[in-house]
Curated annotation (Swiss-Prot):
Name of the protein described by the UniProt record: Ribose import binding protein RbsB
Annotated InterPro entries: Peripla_BP_I, SBP_2_dom
Keywords, alphabetical: Cell membrane, Lipoprotein, Membrane, Palmitate, Signal, Sugar transport, Transport
Keyword Transport among record annotations: yes
Record membrane topology: Lipid-anchor
CDD domains: PBP1_ribose_binding
Length: 305
């Protein structure tokens, strides 16, 4: 009997020892083969602009291709709403943020909130003045402004009288496009007036109506985006004047207007490509890869044929 008990005890000890040698559950290799599905939060300045609708489309297509989920919020050109939207995305636990700032200064608080919890930030089309941003994905806005001024000078000659319709005050795109434009215009053109129309078509129309009354001798208009350019063109057509108008973006309405020989030209961006590049950058960052501080998408001058 004692011998039987001894055998049983020996077997029990053997089994306990074998069990203790098995690695813990977290250390076992996974056989599921599943990869983490990353969620990115996208904050757009406004989806009332065809440019940003195309940009969103590029992000959604690339995210789907990479197995990523996208949560989209529309700031409706309200910087306070955008800050709140981004804070909400952080609370929802997104893995990365893609932000198209309404105002480059105002968005800084939200960027810093993301930094505090380790959520990487990629800005699109416009930069953030403060906070850590992994990369800015945008066209070369300064170069685009220079292209617009050179086009006007080439068409109308030195000293042509030009009006400038500026974008949202505080937006980096407004500042950079204006800076590039004046790099050339201050030497070759006469900028007789400039005023903000907030990247908005209706405001572009209203502002242009007022500018035409105060400056009836305007020969050309450079608008910081196509929406303002198309609004300005409507005001010009109503006045019966023949004025060269160039926009910036290359959206569908602008390209159609150029084809119809109404809008003179646009500095065309590639919003879908910008969205694609931004999503690629976010995915690379989430997988521990390094990205460039600035990722540029090429520009093209679209003119009447």
């Amino acid at each position: 009997m004692k011998k039987a008990v001894s055998v049983i005890l020996t077997l029990s000890l053997f089994l306990l020892t074998a069990c203790s040698l098995e690695p813990p559950q977290w250390a076992k290799p996974s056989n599921s083969g599943n990869k983490k599905e990353f969620t990115i939060g996208l904050s757009v300045s406004t989806l009332n602009n065809p440019f940003f609708v195309s940009l969103k489309k590029g992000i959604e297509k690339e995210a789907k291709k990479r197995g990523m989920k996208v949560i989209i919020v529309d700031a409706q050109n309200d910087s306070s709403k955008q800050t709140s939207d981004v804070e909400d995305l952080i609370q929802q636990g997104v893995d990365a943020l893609l932000i198209n700032p309404t105002d480059s200064s105002a968005i800084s608080t939200a960027v810093e909130s993301a930094n505090a919890v380790g959520v990487p930030v990629v800005t699109i089309d416009r930069s953030a003045e403060q906070g850590k941003v992994e990369t800015l994905v945008a066209s070369d806005n300064v170069k685009g402004g220079e292209m617009a001024a050179a086009f006007i000078a080439d068409k109308l000659g030195k000293g042509a009288k030009v009006a400038e319709l500026e974008g949202v005050p505080g937006a980096s795109a407004t500042r950079e496009r204006g800076s590039g434009f004046h790099n050339i215009a201050d030497q070759k053109l006469q900028v007789v007036t400039k005023q903000s129309a907030d990247f908005d078509r209706t405001k572009g129309l209203t502002v242009m109506e007022n500018l035409l009354q105060g400056h009836p001798d305007i020969q050309a208009v450079f608008a910081h985006n196509d929406e303002m350019a198309l609004g300005a063109l409507e005001a010009i057509n109503s006045s019966g004047k023949d004025i060269l108008v160039i926009g910036f973006d290359g959206n569908k309405d602008a390209l159609a207007s150029i084809k119809d020989r109404k809008l003179s030209a646009t500095v065309a961006q590639q919003p879908e490509l910008i969205g694609k590049l931004a999503t690629e950058a976010a995915d690379d960052i989430l997988h521990g890869k390094k990205v460039q501080k600035t990722i540029s998408a090429p520009l093209k001058l679209e003119t009447q044929k």
